């Protein structure tokens, strides 16, 4: 299991990490958009911003919510059109061990 990317923040400021977690729960809860759709949007954002680990973690969460590899591929296409080919490279790296 990979190291928690927030381990240092948790050590020096656990309150901010708790705030982040409660915000995450609020933002990604079902509403007008399903949790799955929100996670797919977040995958596209992280791919566009170069966050390989974010793509990986969010894609895993999206899959647990029922996302298919085809849906993930489509959100990476959107990220590519909106942000350039780097989003495909980042998405591919992030999905390396997630999609078989």
Q: In which residue ranges do the predicted regions lie?
A:
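Residues within well-ordered alpha-helical secondary structure of globular protein domains
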Residues: 22, 44, 78-81
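Mid-chain, well-packed structural core segment of small domains
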Residues: 51-78
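Short helix-capping/linker segments at secondary-structure and domain boundaries
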Residues: 49-56, 86-90
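Buried hydrophobic packing segments
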Residues: 44-45, 58, 75, 95
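Acidic, glycine/proline-rich low-complexity segments that act as flexible tails and inter-domain linkers
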Residues: 1-37, 60-64, 90-100
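Amphipathic, charged-and-aliphatic alpha-helical interface segments
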Residues: 38-52
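C-terminal structural segments of small proteins and small subunits
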Residues: 71-98
């Amino acid at each position: 299991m990979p190291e928690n990317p927030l381990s240092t923040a948790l050590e020096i400021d656990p309150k901010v990490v708790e705030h982040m977690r409660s915000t995450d729960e609020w933002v990604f809860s079902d509403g007008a958009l399903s949790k799955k759709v929100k996670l797919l949007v977040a995958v596209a954002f992280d791919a566009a911003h170069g966050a390989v680990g974010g793509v990986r973690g969010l894609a895993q969460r999206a899959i647990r919510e029922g996302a298919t590899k085809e849906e993930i591929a489509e959100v990476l296409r959107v990220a590519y059109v909106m942000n350039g080919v780097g989003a495909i490279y980042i998405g591919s790296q992030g999905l390396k061990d997630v999609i078989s």
